[in-house]
């Protein structure tokens, strides 16, 4: 597949065949490592040859985004990633917050995060919001939604460190699995440390809910 130009007519067929072969291999790591070494000769075009089926390739995709991502618009990156790394495309996709400031803020935030850049214009917004804190007036506090929740036969998952940036990913995965999603966005209490934001645990426990406390994402972010 590396001998074929990714723009050629037969490339996608060969690309899908390679993905199928990788899926069948019990231990594809050695082959994948060699593949990634050779792939480096492709430069900016290497993204079109990668898949999300092995760890070395995923890491290669992240490195490519850091090296070349800012040369592409958000929509262009979503289009590329939808083929090579769908879950990452889901993360980068838009989520509508019913507020233009939040829409723009989180689209820019995710784009910069995925391309490993901080743009001066965004840095200015962050500095301004540290004082203005518009999100306080835009979003209701989390406690405002607790009494509205239907907790009968409910299972609660408390995923530490999972902010609203992941809502597009969650929404897309729900659609993929045929699940319905009713999403309400709220703000946490400041400071945003977990120890100051667990009041809902006792409230929901008192209502008889089973609560799963998931810290995997928080551990990844901090370590």
Annotate the PLM regions.
Residues 1-154, 161-223:
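…; additionally, a secondary subgroup of soluble metalloenzymes is captured
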